From Swiss-Prot:
This is Ribosome maturation factor RimM. Pfam families: PRC_RimM, RimM. The keyword Hydrolase does not apply. One of its GO terms (cellular component) is cytoplasm. Its main location: cytoplasm. It comes from Flavobacterium johnsoniae (strain ATCC 17061 / DSM 2064 / JCM 8514 / BCRC 14874 / CCUG 350202 / NBRC 14942 / NCIMB 11054 / UW101) (Cytophaga johnsonae). Binds ribosomal protein uS19. One of its GO terms (molecular function) is ribosome binding. Keywords: Chaperone, Cytoplasm, Ribosome biogenesis, rRNA processing. The PRC barrel domain binds ribosomal protein uS19.
Length: 174
């Protein structure tokens, strides 16, 4: 499976027992959705490798205690601690309305109620406190704050994000 076909679920945080169990930090608001997985993809040497789960249980909120098949010792567990965990995109719960996954809107046109379509979303910058749509308008990159108050509609059918942006926000880039 390719990384582009998957979503990041979390990271193997540490060993849990001498029998090879590990704790996976789940980077999600709903860890209970992932308590009974049969398998996950573990990133190892820049490749996604399937690991099958023998047993798992939630542990202290955001952690999943896991025993993988063929990981039977502390040494086996040491070899995978720190690795990222992925699942296929098909396992993401479907969102409706104006809720969306970041990867879902990449490539969507972005439209302002006043200006009309002004570019395509090329990526999302979530490295700061306020996530931003990175929008390409010809050769010009426009940064648009992802603020619920500005968001009018996610039009999945027409692949558009419709916003009501403050006057001057887009124009200052053009």
């Amino acid at each position: 499976m390719r990384k582009e076909e998957c979503f990041y679920l979390g990271k193997i945080a540490k060993k849990f027992s001498f029998k090879g169990e590990v704790l996976i930090y789940l980077d999600t608001d709903e860890p209970e959705l992932y308590e009974n997985l049969e398998s996950v993809f573990v990133e190892h040497n820049k490749h996604l490798v399937p690991f099958f789960i023998e047993t798992s249980s939630l542990h202290k909120g955001d952690f999943l205690r896991v025993r993988f098949e063929d990981v039977n010792t502390e040494e086996d567990a040491d070899a995978i601690v720190g690795n990222s965990i992925y699942l296929p995109l098909t396992m993401l719960p479907k969102l409706t309305g104006n809720k969306f996954y970041f990867h879902e809107v990449i490539g969507f046109e972005i439209e302002d109620k006043r200006l009309g379509v002004f570019g395509k979303i090329t990526s999302i910058n979530d490295s700061s406190a306020q996530p931003l749509f990175e929008v390409l308008n010809g050769e010009v990159e426009i940064l648009v704050p992802m603020i619920d108050h500005f968001l009018v509609k996610i039009d999945r059918e027409n692949k558009k994000v419709i916003m009501d942006l403050p006057v001057g926000l887009v124009e200052m880039y053009l």
